[in-house]
Amino acid sequence: MKVLSYGSLNIDNVYTVDHFVRSGETMSSLKMEVFSGGKGLNQSIALAKSGVQVWHAGAVGKKDGDFLLEQLEEVGVHIELISKLPVKTGHAIIQRNREGQNCILLFGGANQQVTREQIDHVMEQFSDGDFLILQNEISEIGYIMQKAHEKKMKIVLNPSPMDEKIFTYPLDYVDYFILNEIEARDLCGHDGTGDELLELLAEKFPMAKIVLTLGEEGSIYKDQEKVIRQPVFKVDVVDTTAAGDTFTGFFIGGLV
């Protein structure tokens, strides 16, 4: 069984701030750091650290993407399916406040240049029963899902960032949804408690397994037979950046 993480690769510019910048405000940051990032990359690193052999597919810029490839290789992620394109690598501007909370502005760059030709080549390497991990920061997600379904791969979707494109994807092909309450509300088109959202998702996607993350309240898993509630192990928060991606990687790592 192989795991394919088909997702974004970003250069994260992280600014530590006293508070998030308000409209019209100019403010000095307390610190500036540069990290590897992107939901796809974060999930691949978490998968690799969970002990899983993972192949990452996606795209970076020829001039500024080597840093990200080196980061993936360091933890054992296979990078031969990543394309290097004559465009800028995707990047993010992240504000992180004193409490460790963040807000993020994305530039898609090479992440939005994934082509069907590349996808066809990547999918030739995988087969029945392999896992595909997806989020919503790259182009051609719907086509990737279609090809994975034809291969009888197990499709895991983290519908983040949540936007109108999600509803154009063949969501009935998804085997696992991993999402937070905000994403669940948007996907269902309804407000509600965690339990209510879980039931709505199960009605909408009866064949899928649902993992709903609830922040400091933990998470809930639901499939056709059972519901499992998992509380959190409390720690002092340093930075919430990539927390959801790390959860996704280790959850799937536990299945594989």
Each language-model region and where it sits:
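Glycine-rich phosphate/adenosyl-contacting loop at the front of the ribokinase-like
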Residues: 1-59, 65-70, 237
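Short, conserved phosphate/pyrophosphate- and ester-handling motifs at nucleotide-, phospho-/glycolipid
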Residues: 47, 180, 244
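A glycine-rich helix N-cap at a beta->alpha junction
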Residues: 71-86
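Short gly/ser/thr-rich secondary-structure transition/capping motifs
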Residues: 76, 112-117, 156-162
